[in-house]
Amino acid sequence: MRASISKSSIKGEVFAPPSKSYTHRAITLAALSKESIIHRPLLSADTLATIRASEMFGAAVRREKENLIIQGSNGKPGIPDDVIDAANSGTTLRFMTAIAGLTDGITVLTGDSSLRTRPNGPLLEVLNRLGAKACSTRGNERAPIVVKGGIKGSEVEISGSISSQFISALLIACPLAENSTTLSIIGKLKSRPYVDVTIEMLGLAGVKIHTDDNNGTKFIIPGKQKYDLKQYTVPGDFSSASYLLAAAAMLEGSEITVKNLFPSKQGDKVIIDTLKQMGADITWDMEAGIVTVRGGRKLKAITFDAGSTPDLVPTVAVLASVAEGTSRIENAEHVRYKETDRLHALATELPKMGVSLKEEMDSLTITGGTLEGAEVHGWDDHRIVMSLAIAGMVAGNTIVDTTESVSISYPDFFKDMRNLGAKVKEIPEE
């Protein structure tokens, strides 16, 4: 699908979609518990992949209105009777690869063409040290992956520089190992807030994780624990909401209220402080979970450290494109290992809209100006598509392709934007 986008302003109220990160974790932990109810989960392509994978490990999942009722494996995941297809979901692939190490048999996991390009080497290496046997069928650390269960627990190290999903996956699996595990992070832990979300969720499920140093990069994980996630309500997603907030800040005459944005461990809530730093008219009523943005103010250039919040890079890049001065997005090499190489995708597409941009291995330098309408490629990446779409609302006369990819994290993105008054028309492929 393609979208034709004209100059717009947006007004009204909208609910932030449920958090993808929290939904993935809630489903996964519920599937390892006995019986759980998850209220208001995000049902998107990625989270549906986690549901399907959980069912293959023995969980029973049913939907009742806005809830998921999950009968879990009670800490004993079964052997899947077919290949687990994680589709486009890196979280699903990494979490389920670790859980496969708990079974009494062999599990095969794969994904779509994009997911099969993403690295998994550090996770496979640690699983082997923990007593499982894990390998890539192609010998290149990419899916398809084969795992023979046998995690027993040990003292292991893992790099934190590629993906925090590896660490979260191990934190989820190792509490069910026979023995305790000590997991030490080598180097700087990228995307730390996602690990904090995992530990928060594990605590709600009754699982204990201890940190053994001041930096929080050494985790002591007792074995033979029990999962017991009874009920959980999924919070709103700041990453998905960032496109709504940024659009309103950039578009003159706009004023929107985004609900269901309460304080949480999500690192992406920094989008609110980022917009304030850039000079946007934005307020956050934390107690009510309501963020209000009014457009019209000229935005100022900033330096943005993407180390903890890689998913905000496309949003911030578009904001920088209209800001006065030169902005720098740095500490961002790990953004290259997402659904696409997002730094390269942004460096390719934004100049088509008149943006002056310099790409380096771990950074983007962007000089703000006037966005121009163009036909741009969405790279079949939900975050690239949504960021280019809001750029198109500023520029007008813009066409973005591969718009169906928004189903990964925010299926109602274009619907919500149209309801707020954005001039967006979806064009079926011929």
Curated annotation (Swiss-Prot):
Binding residue positions for 3-phosphoshikimate: K20, S21, R25, S163, S164, Q165, S191, D311, K338
* Record-linked NCBIfam families: aroA
Q: Which reaction does it catalyse?
A: 3-phosphoshikimate + phosphoenolpyruvate = 5-O-(1-carboxyvinyl)-3-phosphoshikimate + phosphate
Keywords for this protein:
Amino-acid biosynthesis, Aromatic amino acid biosynthesis, Cytoplasm, Transferase
Q: Where in the cell is it found?
A: Cytoplasm
Main subcellular location of this protein, as a coarse class: cytoplasm
A GO term from the CC aspect: cytoplasm
This one is known as 3-phosphoshikimate 1-carboxyvinyltransferase
Q: Give the UniProt family note.
A: Belongs to the EPSP synthase family.
Q: Which GO terms describe its biological process?
A: amino acid biosynthetic process; aromatic amino acid family biosynthetic process; chorismate biosynthetic process
Relate the assembly described in the record: Monomer.
InterPro entries hit by this protein:
Enolpyruvate_Tfrase_dom (IPR001986), Enolpyruvate_Tfrase_sf (IPR036968), EPSP_synthase (IPR006264), EPSP_synthase_CS (IPR023193), RNA3'P_cycl/enolpyr_Trfase_a/b (IPR013792)
GO terms (molecular function) for this protein are: 3-phosphoshikimate 1-carboxyvinyltransferase activity
Q: Which domain of life is it from?
A: Archaea
Biological pathway: Metabolic intermediate biosynthesis; chorismate biosynthesis
Asked if the record carries the keyword Secreted, the reply is no
User: Source species, please?
Assistant: Methanosarcina mazei (strain ATCC BAA-159 / DSM 3647 / Goe1 / Go1 / JCM 11833 / OCM 88) (Methanosarcina frisia)
Coiled coil ranges? none
Enzyme Commission number(s): 2.5.1.19
Q: Where is the active site?
A: D311 (proton acceptor)
PANTHER family, per this entry?
Answer: AROM/DEHYDROQUINATE SYNTHASE, PENTAFUNCTIONAL AROM POLYPEPTIDE
Indicate whether Zinc appears among the record's keywords: no
Q: Tell me which SUPFAM superfamilies the record gives.
A: EPT/RTPC-like (SSF55205)
> What does the UniProt record say this protein does?
Catalyzes the transfer of the enolpyruvyl moiety of phosphoenolpyruvate (PEP) to the 5-hydroxyl of shikimate-3-phosphate (S3P) to produce enolpyruvyl shikimate-3-phosphate and inorganic phosphate.
